[in-house]
Every structure is written in structure tokens, then in C-alpha cells.
């Protein structure tokens, strides 16, 4: 995996079944509230302890889209600085949720190359991402199909972000 951080991700180098990344994180009440706020979702189940306590869930849970936004790390890996050197377009995504996510959950996310194919001379890749809790239970899974164009991306220099 470290070679991706220096060389970038190239379609021809990826193999079906190959594990690309793993990430561990601890879910905080602020993470959940921030996700809801980012989506302009003011449903109190995501941030009001008293309201959530009276719900069928018995406490605060993350909104269904919480992990969809979180899944972006698996491709962009902002913490590991892994980058695509090729331009890709999101062609399809299927997100399956199996268990609620609560404040205090310790999650492990992993990503693999699930499928790789050509269609009409164009390259497509399907990533499989899974998130499990500290008990090893499957919390969510996403299949994310991306179309790989022939264009290269020129990344801006760090100083352009300042």
C-alpha cells in the first residue's frame, strides 16, 4: 500500500481482491451532529439525547448517510495522502446499512478492488468497502463503481491551499 502514496493509483496496477486501505476511527457525538448539519438535517435523533432516548433506538444514532460521506476516505485517503493520478468519475454507488452507528462505536473500514472491467473500450473499477464494529459485526458495505478516463490530474501545490 505505501507505493500508492508515492506513485499514485493506476488502473493497470490494481488487481481484483487486492486490499487497498484500512482505517480505524472512533465515532463521537460531534461526528454525528456534524454530518447531520452538513446535510442540513435537523432531525433531533442525531443530536438531542432526550429525544433520542425516547426513540426506538434508545439513544443517538448516526443518520443513514453518515458512512456514505465517510466512505470518501477510502479513495482519497486524506490522512495517507494517497491520490489518483488519473481522472475518475463516480459511475454508481450502492450503500447497504446493517447496524446503527452510535457515539462511542469503534469502527474499522477496509477497501478492496472488487471488480475490474472494460466496456466499449472504457476502464471501470468497482471498489468494495466494508465497515465493521469492535465486535467484528458488519455495519455497512458499499460498492462504488468508477470510470477511469484517460486524463491525468495535476494536483495543486500545497501553498495554493493556504
Model-predicted regions and their roles:
Residues 1-15, 99-162:
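HotDog/MaoC-like acyl-thioester-processing domains
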Residues 1-92, 153-162:
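Hot-dog-fold acyl-thioester-processing enzymes
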Residues 92-99:
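Short glycine/proline-centered loop/turn elements that form peptide/ligand docking sites
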